[in-house]
């Protein structure tokens, strides 16, 4: 039993001089354990029950040792945490003591710096208050609101204790002055600033700044007008920050720009006792031409997307129609059902006229027939045509050929000559002896008179090697051919 316990872990706990706990844990060496085993072997062998008891006791000892180690570790961590808290408290107390000492020193310095004249004026002021007590009470008692603080100056020097308020505070007439400071969050608008961006685009940007006074005494003693100074600083900061940004970054990263501007202003106004809470970029005004260009670009992009969407829709619709056509081609009953559905939809629209499509199979028989040929009138033999036009000069033949198809003149005189046939061809029998007074639609009168003179001077035409035949016996239409 003693050998087994000696083979367990041995823990030594010691308390150092500085209050920390040291835990030392060591194991029995292998040589000692082997010697213990040899001594146990020399002893008379015990029963199996004794061996079991020894093994269980050794396990219990090990468990107890581990538990004690854990408890010691927890206690050491607690002690270290307490020591840290104590050190922090001591540091804070030391800082408070230093501040109190500094305040006492400042108060003593202020009292010493008043001098003899200061003390004389102070005593006279207190005497004046005492002798005019009912009236002076109204002049000495002042009130500041919950959101205000009063910074008091006596003979031009800051009074110890910092700003007064909220509530009632007393001042000494004639030697004390005070200034109220509002501690609420204030805001001002940064006027629009003309800024040249990084990509050489001129824009007008305005913003809003939210700030508050964090230290009333510093805001009065270190800067003349904290709000005005912060406003001027915000204008220059806005120009400096946005000058390093592109137009796309100005339009998309407004939150990052606002955060960067707020950080910069807060660091710059900290010596003034001002805390910048928030900065917001209100508007980025672009030139009119640039706005139009951007609008046109956006519209073109939207149209392109719309075309892509329409094309994709048509593609899907065509695929669906293809599949529907394949299904309808496989089953003729589906086509008949579709036909009936179409008729039903047409009749449901309250139309007075319903169109029933005629089957194309029945129209195919009519479409295969060829139209009848139009018979041409018999042409005049070449000999007769050459005979008829042989006696006239070339300029007459050209005139007759060009005017033959378009003449529509009608004779209004008895013996006048001219082209008076319905086909517009010349007939020799119509030649007269005198000038013709015939008028032709679309033909000048002088031209008709020349044709009449020519017809009167033309000799009779006779066919060679045949009997005398007058041209008037021929059809005027054949003369053209």
UniProtKB/Swiss-Prot annotation:
Membrane-related topology note: Single-pass membrane protein
RNA-binding keyword on record: no
Biased composition (Polar residues): 27-38, 463-473
Compositional bias annotation for Gly residues: 403-421
Keywords: Ion channel, Ion transport, Membrane, Potassium, Potassium transport, Sodium, Sodium channel, Sodium transport, Transmembrane, Transmembrane helix, Transport
Basic and acidic residues bias spans: 86-104
Low complexity bias spans: 1-22, 433-447
Compartments in which it is found: Membrane
Any one GO molecular-function label of the UniProt entry: cholesterol binding
GO BP of this protein: detection of mechanical stimulus involved in sensory perception of touch; mechanosensory behavior; positive regulation of detection of mechanical stimulus involved in sensory perception of touch; positive regulation of mechanosensory behavior; potassium ion transport; response to mechanical stimulus
Assembly with partners or alone: Component of a non-voltage-gated amiloride-sensitive cation channel complex (also called the degenerin channel complex) composed of at least the mec-2, mec-4, mec-6 and mec-10 subunits; the complex mediates mechanotransduction in touch cells. Interacts with mec-6 and mec-4.
Function: Subunit of an amiloride-sensitive cation channel (degenerin channel complex) permeable for sodium, potassium, lithium and N-methylglucamine, and required for mechanosensory transduction (touch sensitivity). Positively regulates the activity of the putative mechanosensory transduction channel. May link the mechanosensory channel and the microtubule cytoskeleton of the touch receptor neurons. Required for the function of a set of six touch receptor neurons.
Protein's recorded name: Mechanosensory protein 2
Native source species: Caenorhabditis elegans
